[in-house]
Amino acid sequence: MLEINNIYNMDCLEGLKLLSDNSIDLVVTSPPYNMRTRIRNGEYTTREKSEHFSKKYEHFSDDLTIEEYYDFHKNVLTELLRVSKCVLWNYQIVTGSKSAVFKLIGDFADQI
């Protein structure tokens, strides 16, 4: 079990599994966007040209297949909805992730 009022530097899924149901009042998160391609200045840009957008994720490839990306978010959302009374999930639908995000919205429609 995690102690309250402490900061833990750990994988979010590992940490979430250590929390009790409904033990968090509010979660605000901005998950990785899986930016394989991105529209920049009205044009599609390859990941190589927009590398500085993805560099902040040192331990996350940000270049997952749609299936891997969906599974990652499904696991995180399942745990967030279990431990939190309210979840604010800031998400931008970018080119490389649209189908996974829309599937997640459909799969979690009754819970969100």
Which residues make up each language-model segment?
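Core catalytic lobe of class I
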Residues: 2-112
